[in-house]
Regions:
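Short glycine-enriched loop/turn motifs at secondary-structure junctions
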Residues: 1-3, 59-64, 97-98
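N-terminal beta-strand motif that seeds the catalytic metal site of vicinal oxygen chelate
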Residues: 1-15, 65-67
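Short beta-strand-to-loop elements that line the ligand-binding cleft
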Residues: 8, 29, 92-96
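Vicinal oxygen chelate
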Residues: 13, 67-113
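Amphipathic alpha-helical segments
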Residues: 14-26
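A generic "structured core" feature
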Residues: 17, 36-37, 45, 88-91
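Short secondary-structure junctions
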Residues: 25-31, 87-91
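Conserved short beta-strand elements that form part of the metal-binding/catalytic scaffold
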Residues: 27-62, 113-118
Length: 120
């Protein structure tokens, strides 16, 4: 068995595709209408489709998981994030852990938690 993808729920799939391309360089590989596979194994699922599958509500900002990215030039990434998406809601600003790794945590446009850190 092999883990193939990670799926996150989004309200506007086109807006989210642009967001993940702008910030992380992810490209669309397949558009299934309401479900979109991006490079690096990230899948965007429209909220209404997901609600139909689950037959229930989607819990935003649940902090049960996060998408983790690594970026050696993290200060440049933070500048880009602030320039392109100034309304970003931060969980924590750029911080340095005791072991020397720099990280930042924030929510995407739909409340999915993202962490960006320098390589360990």
């Amino acid at each position: 068995m092999k883990l193939r993808n990670v799926l996150i729920v989004v309200k506007d799939i086109e807006q989210s595709k642009k967001y993940y391309h702008d910030l992380f360089g992810l490209e669309m590989l397949l558009d299934n209408g309401g479900n979109m596979i991006l490079s690096e194994g990230l899948v965007l699922q429209e909220e209404e489709c997901w609600k139909d599958f689950l037959q229930g509500d989607v819990l935003l900002r649940n902090n049960h998981s996060e998408l983790y990215f690594e970026e050696a030039e993290i200060e440049s990434f933070v500048d880009k994030l602030e320039r392109l998406y100034p309304e970003t809601e931060y969980v924590n600003s750029l911080t340095t852990h005791s072991w020397g790794q720099k990280v930042i945590r924030f929510y995407d446009l739909d409340g999915n938690l993202i962490e960006v850190g320098t390589p360990a």
